[in-house]
Amino acid sequence: SNCSSLTNITVPDSVTVLDGLAFSYCTNLKNIELSKNLTEIGMGALSHCTSLETIDIPDSVIIMDNIAMAGCSELKSVNIGSNLKTVGGQVFAGCTSLEKVNVNLNNKNYTSENGIWYDKNKTKIILYPYNKKDSAYTTPTSLKELCNGYVGSYGILLDNSNLKTVTIEKNVAKIDDYAIGFVFDFDNYKINKVKDFTVKGYRGTVAESYAKKNSFNFVALDKTLQTPSISKLENTSGGIKISWNKVSGAYGYRVYQKTSNGWKRIKDTTATSYTDSAVSVNQTKTYT
């Protein structure tokens, strides 16, 4: 550690464990080729290598310990091998230039899509890169939660100031505090809210409640259905029969009657007609 003169190194294949802090604060290290037999990257082993821009995690690596690469501020891309299983806390904390994480397709524990690191079934995000350039993100339909990030820093899952809009699908059942719409200010060591942040989602879901709780813009994705038009009014032996056109996408209809106190709901139905039996001779009624 603290080898400021070190710029390039190849770790011999005889090395199976990279000890904690092994190359920490090697601030001029630009290239490192890890052992093909490496199984573990120890705590802080490659932390604060501030000149390192890319790294390949070999297929042999199973464990990346806490803060393994924290503070690698120029790191732009990470390639993760096929056998990584255990990932410690804040492994990439403070890697503020990181744009993409690519996971080997044969990895049974993790996957990646568009540079974002997920668990294998894409039910949760492992890491959304700090410096990914996209201004908008839509959660996969498989995603179940937006929980506080432990691989990144300080509990913020989508810690990216470029990100202004997140669209949340219906399957997301949980959003932790500060998970989205916030960024960590490393200079002043505090959490800031993203200006003009927008959450898109469905009414009555965690997306709407999270947006309202944090005073973010909320855009509802629920379909706006057409109001049915009354197609026929007729007198029948049972009363006045009201018929209307079927509206595509509607699962039911509500019939209202105008009263002296305003509109009164008189019927919920899945049919496209309703017969009002509460009528009398010379009576006028208004429906909608």
Model-flagged regions — what are they?
Residues C3-V17, C26-E40, C49-I63, C72-T86, ...:
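Structural signature of tandem-repeat unit edges
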Residues K223-G249, V281:
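Pro/Thr/Ser/Gly-rich low-complexity, intrinsically disordered linker/stalk tracts
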